[in-house]
């Protein structure tokens, strides 16, 4: 998922095409491997095993999944779930393609549409963040009052972001690729350069910068500036959707219950598993991240208010696709409905 971030849009899209062609080849190999007796350990009788890969190291932004595991929400629905944490070298679509995992976490809406564009048999089946938590962060004394003020300034970006929200920023605000600087997940370059701007999650990097730099940075949540993407999506292979839709539905229902509990109940069970998986995490960071998820409505705002946690709609996906395709990211004749499946999310009963 992570490339140099300094190439042209055409080269970026070419990289995506290459990766997804590898993904499709991997799916074919996975189908052959399914005939082999060398399978993963089976779940206990009456339980379905689900291996779920997250998109980053264990953190509060995955708290609902860990909470569902810790409080038995998956088990009570007949699932034996293993959470495999991600990281900078983890490619969730490739893990799905190889059969190494059953479900995966998609960071943003571009991922699902990229898969659809390459006819990869993987779909988004739920979105556990109605607002993408991505932010741009600036020093408070640089006269930056809006995203538009960042044009022409150096911006520290992760490789994956160059083919995601950066495309939207270039189109809407006229940003250019020569502004991009490599983001290595350290605040040090940002702190060393008062003119620098860096990406981050509203739940993480602003807190780290405040602690390490001793000042409160200016923070701009892209979702509040019109960026329409979902985040924290669950990706499912078409094969699993067809073979065991009940397991997919159970996973989504249990995860929604886990998120409700994590945000509005006692988060300690989920936090304990997060801290176990990621010893570099701290309780203070978890606490402030959870508070910000609630304050910004990342999980429970938008369609989740009426449809429940995890909700997705045709209208929201079509809106995102229209914006992306109008910017030349996707062909306008792409069938956006190949990117997602709404059968597992439905409005709450009145």
Residue map of PLM features:
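Short, glycine-/small- and polar/acidic-enriched structural segments
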Residues: 41-183, 187-203, 220, 228
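Periplasmic-binding protein-like
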Residues: 128-138, 214-244, 252, 290-296, ...
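Conserved C-terminal helix/tail region of periplasmic/extracytoplasmic solute-binding proteins
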Residues: 314-350
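Secondary-structure end/capping motifs
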Residues: 242-327
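Bacterial N-terminal signal peptides that target proteins for export
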Residues: 4-24
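C-terminal motif of bacterial Sec signal peptides marking the signal peptidase cleavage site
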Residues: 31-34
